[in-house]
Amino acid sequence: MSTKVLIANRGEIACRVIATCRRLGIATVAVYSDADRNARHVRLADEAIHIGPAAARESYLRGDALLDAARATGAQAIHPGYGFLSENADFADACAAAGITFIGPPASAIRAMGDKSAAKALMAKAGVPLTPGYHGDQQAPDFLRTQADAIGYPVLIKASAGGGGKGMRKVERSEDFVDALASCQREAASAFGNDHVLVEKYVERPRHIEIQVFGDSHGDAVYLFERDCSVQRRHQKVLEEAPAPGMSAERRAAMGQAAVDAARAVGYVGAGTVEFIAGPDGDFYFMEMNTRLQVEHPVTEYITGTDLVEWQLRVASGQPLPLRQEQLAIHGHAIEARLYAEDADRGFLPSTGTLRRLRLPAPSAHVRVDTGVEEGDSITPYYDPMIAKLIVWDVDRDAALRRMSQALADCQVVGVTTNAGFLRRLVNTDSFAHARLDTALIEREQAALSAVGDTDDALWQLAAVAAVASTAGATTDARDPHSPWQAQDGWRLGASAPRVLPLQQGERRHTLKVWTQAGGWRVQCDDAAPMRVTGTADAQGLAVQLGERRWTLQLLRDGDQLYLFGADGQHRFTLHDPVGESDHAVADAGSLLAPMPGRIVATLVAAGTEVKRGTPLVVLEAMKMEHTLQAPADGTVKGYRAKAGDQVGDGAVLVDFDAA
């Protein structure tokens, strides 16, 4: 094998590759952009070399810079990770021309599978089942709509060169087709530099099942069983598990053989994934082949006891596959959840900022955490906002589900908004718990997944106690608890006044009053009867009793944000200044602000138009995806402060708005 490997990637996958290389005694070279100068993968590698500015197209997507870095450091091989140049055939060719091993499939296989239309034709010849659709070169909007009409709705528009859920739209009606096509093509052109699309029949209530395949240069190929990736939003995977629930041995063998046939058809070498759409009737159809390691590969590693990165390194050096098909077996059940910096209650808008607190579950035989960040690092608008992958394993699915729910509850993240609460609710939905899986599961479970009303009422009282305790010097077990200078009870001549604390979580808001008393507090929420809370509390946490329940919670105060961490997860409250709140409940009802830095793609409503709350007004491209910003209330669009093509900063005013 190579003795020094350059990793042409960043974040958690770069750290993942470094870990295996270190175990095998292989030296590693990290590359970094301006934004990643102090990133975790840079700190972990044996060497690191700068390759350009923060923008990916000027750094991680520059094949020439990566090859220069490999030559400068004496790296004999390049591991591309996933994303960026991992499926770029020209880059694979350039590595070969430079005498540097590309740890991936041959360029010919990447080309064959990279164009989805051509790949479909190739799979048809190989006898791999296909969904009905149009995979040709004609791209005129009217022609494609005619094809969609003939196929029958709903249809799926997909970027031919795409992946990762980008450049993909489901269309329900003919009259919506042209607008969906335009949006899909814009996103595809931006993400892949190619706006060519194909149109396919959308299989109702489909499951997304993929097969992990591996080939070597000696002509052998195996499948390492399946992963169920049906739980998605916006065509991006949210939860992945292996093996697929309810998979019969016969269907597993049939799908595995079809995947191996697909790999053999293109002379595949290395790790690859063949993705299928599976219908409720048991039929399955080839969707695409990803010619790289997948984000969700750890669940396969858990159930097979393999290290797929090690397999990649060995196969790339010309060694045969480490195991034959008959030596591979499934052991237990594994589930992966992707912890993202995003706001599930605001359409999954990405969140940027500094990780002022980051506590993830402790790794064990049952829990694995793959991450590219540490406390103090920043989530920037330049790259994917993943914080970590949480992977759990146990002897069966029910046990693995319990472990995942607890792992998500153990996550403590301050500085950005995350999807941890959403993921925990998702894992605990009836549909997921009972394996009623399809790609519409999240849409179907919207009511259960909403965070509105999710917080236990008792936690509001405890949050109020925490707000008092987080004040400097406030603690019921202070050195002299009887000293008047330690009192936080609002005492004044003539009466004992409570602390008045307006607290907010999401759209829910309450005013709480707290009286500090001997051994605890008396807390009133709005006009309800006051409740007695006993125990101890300080700026680090609470150990208290409310009614018949005992609570042990960690506490963190970050400006006006109050965080409670307990056995059921993380709870964030905003503490408002009670002075003048009635006049300033909304920071600025007369405008629509950019939720993150990005580029304006389109303005959707003319100035002067009266709109309803939720009407789409602006399309913003950020973090490789298009995000539609909606009217905050009923009212009139007065005008726009940015036009299509403009770059805007976080918090920039985009629309002047008159609320009705």
Regions found by a protein language model. Give the residues of each.
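Structured functional modules or segments
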Residues: 582-660
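Short acidic-glycine loop/turn motifs at beta-strand connectors
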Residues: 173, 215-220, 279-282, 362, ...
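Long, charged amphipathic helices and adjacent flexible linkers at domain junctions
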Residues: 323-331, 443-446, 450, 570-594
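Conserved nucleotide-binding/hydrolysis modules and their immediate coupling elements
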Residues: 307, 516-551
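Structured, non-catalytic alpha/beta "coupling" segments that mediate domain-domain communication
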Residues: 77, 87-94, 336, 346, ...
